[in-house]
Amino acid sequence: MAFRGRRPELRGPPELYYDKNEARKYVRNSRMIDVQIKMTGRALELLCVPEDKPCYVLDIGCGTGLSGDYLSDEGHYWVGIDISPAMLDEALDRETQGDVILGDMGQGIPFKPGTFDACISISAVQWLCNANKKSDIPAKRLYCFFSSLYSVLVRGGRAVLQLYPENSEQLELITTQATRAGFTGGVVVDYPNSAKAKKFYLCLFSGPSTSLPEGLSEDTEEEKPAESTFTADRIPYRIARRGVVRKSREWVLEKKARRRRQGKEVCPDTQYTGRKRKPRF
């Protein structure tokens, strides 16, 4: 029973830990899907990419493609990289709209310089802090990852990496290697006083240093506990993405709220918000 509480990174290499059974959970467990989608939405919000212009986004540790589906839903194009063949097989079975490749981020990002406008990563970077074989040196693998990421981003591009650091020393190791690679930025912490809802987002800028976004707190948004449910079938990716119908009133209100948090000017909500226009003569 004590084994259940161990961090996934301590149970073995990611390509072995994320086998077919583990990959299946990511498309059948409603709790895992909901958490993944919320963190992706928050990462995209922290990126501050233009909402009226599609961007080319790199998804590090893309897994089954849930984060990529969210990006597609927001009108962006994406490419994902993951070290687990089983996770990528699930992504292909779900017919994700982005391209996925098998690769180890600790060995660098295999793309030409200036390929991507932005990058996101959900729950992946902390895996680089563990040495699964004698040749693995966490500091070197982190630097290789960040230096190649810096290269593949356009000038002024941003990366938001959600991660679960084991302790403050591990977080310092990650941020130090990112700084060595040329990035500016810092860590944004959402719900810092909550044991369960607390989330770390490493916000990196490949251009001039800018002010970091503010982290969410219990005063800005109330976190509600969610329950896990399992189904025998895969959840269709359009339902798994958000549970909100695109262009619906709820979808419009959520998008306007996100723009307000980014400090953008947004029209006030009215009874006509999200209502479809009648056809003209």
From Swiss-Prot:
The keyword Transcription applies. It is found in: Nucleus; Nucleus, Nucleoplasm; Cytoplasm, Perinuclear region; Cytoplasm. Its EC number is 2.1.1.-. May be ubiquitinated and targeted to degradation in response to pro-inflammatory cytokine signaling. Keywords: Chromatin regulator, Cytoplasm, Methyltransferase, Nucleus, Ribosome biogenesis, rRNA processing, S-adenosyl-L-methionine, Transcription, Transcription regulation, Transferase, Ubl conjugation. It holds the Pfam family Methyltransf_11. One of its GO terms (cellular component) is nucleolus. Residues 256-281 are annotated as: Disordered. SUPFAM superfamilies: S-adenosyl-L-methionine-dependent methyltransferases. GO terms for molecular function: protein heterodimerization activity; rRNA (guanine) methyltransferase activity. Transmembrane segments: none annotated. It comes from the Eukaryota. The keyword Acyltransferase does not apply. Its main location: nucleus. GO terms for biological process: chromatin organization; positive regulation of rRNA processing; rRNA (guanine-N7)-methylation. It catalyses: a guanosine in 18S rRNA + S-adenosyl-L-methionine = an N(7)-methylguanosine in 18S rRNA + S-adenosyl-L-homocysteine. Heterodimer with TRMT112; this heterodimerization is necessary for the metabolic stability and activity of the catalytic subunit BUD23. Interacts with GRIP1. S-adenosyl-L-methionine-dependent methyltransferase that specifically methylates the N(7) position of a guanine in 18S rRNA. Requires the methyltransferase adapter protein TRM112 for full rRNA methyltransferase activity. Involved in the pre-rRNA processing steps leading to small-subunit rRNA production independently of its RNA-modifying catalytic activity. Important for biogenesis end export of the 40S ribosomal subunit independent on its methyltransferase activity. Locus-specific steroid receptor coactivator. Belongs to the class I-like SAM-binding methyltransferase superfamily. BUD23/WBSCR22 family. This is 18S rRNA (guanine-N(7))-methyltransferase. It comes from Bos taurus (Bovine).
